[in-house]
């Protein structure tokens, strides 16, 4: 069973969950439609007919929302690997509207140019990363050969490697403008008000001759209204609107989706058994060497640990296991770190995800998004770096170890507390 955002244990990552609501559902249909057309041509050595292409389009548009979201989450994982680590957080913040757009650089290929990626399983075509960005986040129907039609904004400082979708535009020629009028006017029933020649002045040609615009032949199976409507629909809203994202606004971070609204049970304060921090994701598919893992927003942590296979492989949804790196002595640790403000983790506010623009409405099932083993450590906007989690690990496991080893330590007297702490000190009441 898929979660509303299709973030299974192997696919969950803050980067993916933050960007998924901003992916256009049109991108799934477009990438798959292009692949079907290429496959058909290789097999039959002829192009699809309009009827066949329209049938494939309708089939893809009617695909289950979980399938589209699962595809989008895997593609976002690939995008993350091909973006420079120092640009990933800026990319998320700019796409979610928390920060002004800035350059987001692609990892260069062997020639120093923008990388190309495959967007489907067993794909026979690779797409330039900037093309993928524009299709994913703007819903522009570009082909894989349209790279030279892209133009970078004047404020873009690195046009050779920048893949920021807000820095990328599409060049329009005079022919495009001319055709746009004749294609849009019959579809909408209205013409440009600036046109000095009204509809009454356009007279039909005699002797059955067709006007020039009547000879236009579209190569695709989309009309203007349908294309615009589908390209503006987020992939996360395919299950049907029921409430507005405007009700979910909350400050901080680059999330803005309440765990309660998503069907996830609220994270309560630490219990007597103590919180357990799940092992971080195996970064085989989501992490590169030396990458930072961002848990932005008040108290966001990764899902329970699991092994990440190849991006095109099947998803393993087996229950996660928690591991402890070692034993911690409760009393001796208190003497060294009790004065740290991080120790009073029970007083932090409950985790709330923050940051998706209220552009559309979402409706999700009420089931739990991810299996929860216990409340997470809550602290606003923390960056966890590899090899620097000693104090955090102590905070996560000190209560659990203290409670579990309490009966064993009852046979020997505990060492006296430091002078800075006493039984009446309210700071020690947390433990």
UniProtKB/Swiss-Prot annotation:
Keywords for the protein's UniProt record, in alphabetical order: Activator, DNA replication, DNA-binding, Nucleus, Transcription, Transcription regulation
Location relative to the cell: Nucleus
Gene Ontology CC: one annotated term: nucleus
InterPro entries in the cross-refs: CTF/NFI (IPR000647), CTF/NFI_DNA-bd-dom (IPR020604), CTF/NFI_DNA-bd_CS (IPR019739), CTF/NFI_DNA-bd_N (IPR019548), MAD_homology1_Dwarfin-type (IPR003619)
Molecular function via GO: DNA-binding transcription factor activity, RNA polymerase II-specific; RNA polymerase II cis-regulatory region sequence-specific DNA binding
Keyword Transcription belongs to the record: yes
SMART domains in UniProt: DWA (SM00523)
Motif placement: 9aaTAD: 389-397
Region Disordered, residue ranges: 259-319, 404-431
Low complexity bias locations: 296-309, 420-431
GO process terms (BP): DNA replication; positive regulation of DNA-templated transcription; regulation of transcription by RNA polymerase II
PANTHER family in the cross-refs: NUCLEAR FACTOR 1 X-TYPE, NUCLEAR FACTOR I
Homology family: Belongs to the CTF/NF-I family.
Function: Recognizes and binds the palindromic sequence 5'-TTGGCNNNNNGCCAA-3' present in viral and cellular promoters and in the origin of replication of adenovirus type 2. These proteins are individually capable of activating transcription and replication.
Quaternary assembly: Binds DNA as a homodimer.
Domain comment (free text): The 9aaTAD motif is a transactivation domain present in a large number of yeast and animal transcription factors.
Name this polypeptide is given: Nuclear factor 1 X-type
Species of origin: Gallus gallus
Name of the encoding gene: NFIX
């Amino acid at each position: 069973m898929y979660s509303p955002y299709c973030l299974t244990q192997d696919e969950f990552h803050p980067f993916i969950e933050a960007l998924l609501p901003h992916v256009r559902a049109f991108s799934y249909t477009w990438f798959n439609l292009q692949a079907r057309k290429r496959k058909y041509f290789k097999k039959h050595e002829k192009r699809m007919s309009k009827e066949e292409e329209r049938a494939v389009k309708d089939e893809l548009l009617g695909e289950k929302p979980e399938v589209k979201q699962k595809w989008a989450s895997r593609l976002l994982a690939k995008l993350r690997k091909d973006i420079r680590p120092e640009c990933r957080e800026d990319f998320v913040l700019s796409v979610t509207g928390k920060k002004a757009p800035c350059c987001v650089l692609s990892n260069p290929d062997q020639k120093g140019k923008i990388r190309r990626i495959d967007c489907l399983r067993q794909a026979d075509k690779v797409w330039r990363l900037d093309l993928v960005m524009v299709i994913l986040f703007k819903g522009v129907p570009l082909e894989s050969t349209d790279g030279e039609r892209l133009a970078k904004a004047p404020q873009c400082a690195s046009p050779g490697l920048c893949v920021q979708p807000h820095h990328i535009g599409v060049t329009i020629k005079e022919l495009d403008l001319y055709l746009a009028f004749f294609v849009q006017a019959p579809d909408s029933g209205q013409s440009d008000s600036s046109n000095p020649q009204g509809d009454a002045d356009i007279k039909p040609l005699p002797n059955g001759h067709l006007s020039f615009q009547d000879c236009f032949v579209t190569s695709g199976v989309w009309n203007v209204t349908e294309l615009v409507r589908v390209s503006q629909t987020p992939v996360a809203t395919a299950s049907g609107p029921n409430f507005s994202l405007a009700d979910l606004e909350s400050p901080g971070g680059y999330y803005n989706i309440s765990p309660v609204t998503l069907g996830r049970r609220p994270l309560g304060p630490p219990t007597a058994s103590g919180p357990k921090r799940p092992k971080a994701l195996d970064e085989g598919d989501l992490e590169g060497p030396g990458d930072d893992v961002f848990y932005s927003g008040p108290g966001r942590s990764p899902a329970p640990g699991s092994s990440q296979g190849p991006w095109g492989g099947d998803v393993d949804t087996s229950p996660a296991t928690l591991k402890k790196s070692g034993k911690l002595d409760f009393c001796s640790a208190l003497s060294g770190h009790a004065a740290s403000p991080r120790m009073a983790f029970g007083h932090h506010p409950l985790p709330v995800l923050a940051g998706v623009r209220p552009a559309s409405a979402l409706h999700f099932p009420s089931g739990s998004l991810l299996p929860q083993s216990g409340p997470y450590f809550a602290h606003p906007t923390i960056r966890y770096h590899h090899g620097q989690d000693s104090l955090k690990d102590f905070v996560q496991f000190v209560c659990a170890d203290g409670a579990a080893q309490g009966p064993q330590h009852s046979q020997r007297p505990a060492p006296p507390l430091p002078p800075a702490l006493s039984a009446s000190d309210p700071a020690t009441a947390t433990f």
